[in-house]
Amino acid sequence: MSPHENPSVETRTESDTFGPIEVPAHRYWGAQTQRSIQNFKIGTERQPAPLVHALGIVKQAAALVNKDLGGLDPKIADAIAESAAEVVAGKHDDEFPLVVWQTGSGTQSNMNANEVIASLANERLGGKRGGKSPVHPNDHCNRGQSSNDTFPTAMHIAVAREVQERLLPALSHLHTALDAKAKEFESIVKIGRTHLQDATPVSLGQEFSGYAAQVALGGARIAATLPGVLALAQGGTAVGTGLNAHPEFAERFAAKVAELTGLPFTSAENKFEALATHDALVFLQGALTALASGLFKIANDIRLLGSGPRSGLGELSLPENEPGSSIMPGKVNPTQCEALTMVCAQVVGNGTTVSFAGSQGHFELNVFKPVIANAVLQSVRILADASVSFTDNCVVGIKANTDRISDLMSRSLMLVTALAPSIGYDKAAEIAKTAHKNGTTLKEEALRLGYVTDEEFERVVRPETMLAPSAE
């Protein structure tokens, strides 16, 4: 909130190249952050916390590298690094109030970090909150940097950390649960379905093994995009040339970030590409969208197989977690499936946002950076959270309704497929169509038509033998 909107807030005067401006006295931010608060009253979406923490990593690493290169007084550099470490730890999240909808380079958020960290460092060195002495937001915290390379670097750091520390473990958790169900259900034979119609048999375990494989492959595709995300733009400064940065800064900076995060970050080979495009994040979002597609299918299958309890497919019983209706007593809904599919719908929408925003690299700079960062980070976070929720509150508690599965299996006309190799497709189709028309069983019609004997039918039409290739 602007101090002008709340006169009771005590203020101090800060200044930038536009002149003086009043800032809440208890806040660590300065003039440029305050101007952004006043100029961009758009929505409620603040810069994501992982991005704020990543900006802290950038400032911490830059200060330490600049100290090593002789570009910063050691006392100032250490004060900046220590203050930035507090930002990384989330101790000052409430000092980062800026919304996503700001300048497309993220300049205001970069300056928000510079101002807060400089203010913290000034207090460390015996100075006062705010101001520009002894630590200056631009001259010291932003030394050898531009918003144009700092913000994309923070984007990559934030996304890589979230994928590595949050999403991939969540997918592993889901995969483990689905794989356990595949093994638990491996001996339960059920009717398969294609085009929403009866098909030949599968085991329930085989069906779940497909889900498990889909999750594993989705995670692998996401992991395969990380090398591009681990390449950092820092050192390109304003347009990719590296103006005002030490020749060794970029490589040393990437190594320092790798040391601080434990992730193998590198310096981007071509800084012009790293500033003007966000293809690496578009690529990652594509993999996230593919994962969302797969998770939607899995959740949809499970809720359909659990439909009922008396008038649906009813092959599965899903955990009953909460009442499902305010008007229908006793109704329970597949809420975890619904939550996951809504997450997937959001991620698919984010894919459209990121693809379009990624195309907006006009000349030397893409200026849709904050919306790309927000969309990708949201995709990663909600996919991770939903995967854990779906696992813990649904998948682990799924039970097979074996009586219902057996009943549906015994009435399926598609078991006739097993007869096709011996009597031919046309005769097998005739048996199925006649049984459907007359309301009789396959066996009754096969014997009446004289195409097989009782012994032949019993030997061939056995669902448990129809789950794998056969030489017979």
UniProtKB/Swiss-Prot annotation:
Alphabetically ordered keywords of this record: Cytoplasm, Lyase, Tricarboxylic acid cycle
Sites annotated Important for catalytic activity: E338
Residue numbers spanned by region Disordered: 1-20, 127-149
Catalytic residue positions: H195 (proton donor/acceptor), S325
Binding site for substrate: 105-107, 136-139, 146-148, 194, 326, 331-333
InterPro entries, A to Z: Fum_hydII, Fumarase/histidase_N, Fumarase_C_C, Fumarate_lyase_CS, Fumarate_lyase_fam, Fumarate_lyase_N, L-Aspartase-like
GO molecular function (one): fumarate hydratase activity
GO cellular component, one term: cytoplasm
Subcellular location: Cytoplasm
Pathway membership, UniProt: Carbohydrate metabolism; tricarboxylic acid cycle; (S)-malate from fumarate: step 1/1
CDD domains tied to this protein: Fumarase_classII
Reactions it catalyzes: (S)-malate = fumarate + H2O
Keyword hit for Cytoplasm: yes
The EC number(s) this enzyme carries: 4.2.1.2
GO biological process, one term: malate metabolic process
Function: Involved in the TCA cycle. Catalyzes the stereospecific interconversion of fumarate to L-malate.
Assembly, per entry: Homotetramer.
Anything else known: There are 2 substrate-binding sites: the catalytic A site, and the non-catalytic B site that may play a role in the transfer of substrate or product between the active site and the solvent. Alternatively, the B site may bind allosteric effectors.
Family of this protein: Belongs to the class-II fumarase/aspartase family. Fumarase subfamily.
Name of the protein: Fumarate hydratase class II
